């Protein structure tokens, strides 16, 4: 019996060693614009946050990016800020380019995230800023993926 058990265990180990993980699609190394100076006297003024994501498609099929959103979470403030640490903003209308990643290839995805800021007139008060963690969410033909940027995005205001 022990010899038979040893043979079975050896066969299972050989099978496990010879099998490979299924091909996947993955996102790595996301970054966002480090800072944006909100124009003095702005009230909910629109601007764009730029991000990049490294994508790797190890599958045999093209992967299409169907939609994207971005979640910005306020992680720290300096001075007087309209929002509190922990407040979240989910941006819709996020644009990703290119919208496809070829089979067995890598691509740098350029992401534009609509945002807005408010600032008093410069010189009328002490400067303030808010730092945001940015998490990007992509729905693709290979499934749904999320990745946090390795840096924060800071909005600077009067």
Listing of model-derived features with the role each one plays in the protein:
Residues 1-8:
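Bacterial N-terminal signal peptides that target proteins for export
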Residues 30, 73, 114-158:
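Surface-exposed edge beta-strand/loop patches
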Residues 31-32, 44-52, 129-132:
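Short, solvent-exposed loop/turn segments enriched in Ser/Thr/Gly
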Residues 88-132:
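Short, solvent-exposed, Trp/other aromatic-anchored flexible loops in extracytoplasmic proteins
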């Amino acid at each position: 019996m022990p010899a038979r058990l040893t043979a079975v265990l050896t066969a299972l180990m050989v099978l496990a060693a010879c099998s490979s993980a299924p091909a996947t699609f993955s996102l790595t190394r996301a970054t966002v614009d480090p800072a944006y100076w909100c124009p003095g006297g702005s009230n909910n003024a629109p601007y764009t946050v730029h991000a990049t994501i490294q994508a790797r498609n190890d599958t045999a099929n093209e992967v299409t990016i169907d939609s994207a959103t971005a979640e910005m979470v306020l992680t720290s403030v300096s001075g007087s800020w309209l929002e509190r640490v922990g407040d979240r903003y989910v941006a819709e209308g996020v644009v990703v380019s290119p919208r496809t990643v070829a089979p067995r290839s890598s691509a740098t995805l350029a992401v534009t995230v609509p945002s807005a800021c408010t600032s008093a007139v410069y010189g009328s008060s002490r400067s303030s800023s808010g730092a945001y963690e940015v998490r990007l969410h992509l729905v693709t033909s290979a499934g749904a993926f999320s990745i946090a940027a390795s840096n924060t995005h800071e909005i600077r205001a009067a």
